[in-house]
């Protein structure tokens, strides 16, 4: 975990150092239809054992590079005023407990960003897609290598410039094979994360 913190701190400091202009406090970033966002987030997965049959304490670091495109102008005229973005994300998880194993997936993604607060922009996101892991057969909750991962969460973006933002947030992850093989109790976890995005 300290290694992830050092990486994110270094990246955030680097983005600040490369900013060549002073960002006015009263200036809002302009995100229009067609604006693309490339981001990288990292966090640490913490297990949830929702039933007595869930016995595995899977946990470990996660890395999530992503690409998105804004597909709407701001909608609404109150606190919920916001924009919709669509895109995709890769996810890599290194499970460090109870065994050192790995998982990798690809998830289409949708995000709704609230724009009423100018540079500070809360958002909600949802993603889901195929996920491969070598946990299969090593824990009672998973019986197949091919699975699906579903993710729902929220976060906050703070725009350092018109094109650079720092992000922090929380996700709930569910990993299972969708009933294609049994047993299929699935894995559930919290994933607090931090990262950055570039817009162009």
Identify the role of each PLM range.
Residues 24-35, 71-84, 98-100, 115-122, ...:
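Short loop/turn motifs that connect adjacent beta-strands in outer-membrane beta-barrel proteins
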Residues 89-129:
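Mid-length scaffold segments of soluble, non-membrane domains
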């Amino acid at each position: 975990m300290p290694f992830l913190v050092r990486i994110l701190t270094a990246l955030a400091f680097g983005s600040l150092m490369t900013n060549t202009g002073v960002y006015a406090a009263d200036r809002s970033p302009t995100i229009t239809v067609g604006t693309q966002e490339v981001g990288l987030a990292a966090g640490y997965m913490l297990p949830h054992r929702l039933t007595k049959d869930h016995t595995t304490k899977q946990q470990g670091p996660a890395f999530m590079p992503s690409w998105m495109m804004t597909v709407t102008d701001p909608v609404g005229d109150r606190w919920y005023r916001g924009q919709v973005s669509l895109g995709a994300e890769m996810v890599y998880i290194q499970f460090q407990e109870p065994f050192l194993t790995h998982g990798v997936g690809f998830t289409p993604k949708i995000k709704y960003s609230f724009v009423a607060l100018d540079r500070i922009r809360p958002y909600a996101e949802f993603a889901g897609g195929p996920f491969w892991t070598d946990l299969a057969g090593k824990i009672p909750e998973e019986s197949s290598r091919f699975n699906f991962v579903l993710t729902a969460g929220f976060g906050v973006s703070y725009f350092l410039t018109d094109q650079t933002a720092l992000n922090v947030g929380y996700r709930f992850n569910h990993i299972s094979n969708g009933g294609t093989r049994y047993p299929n109790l699935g894995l559930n976890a919290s994933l607090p994360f931090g990262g950055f995005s570039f817009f162009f």
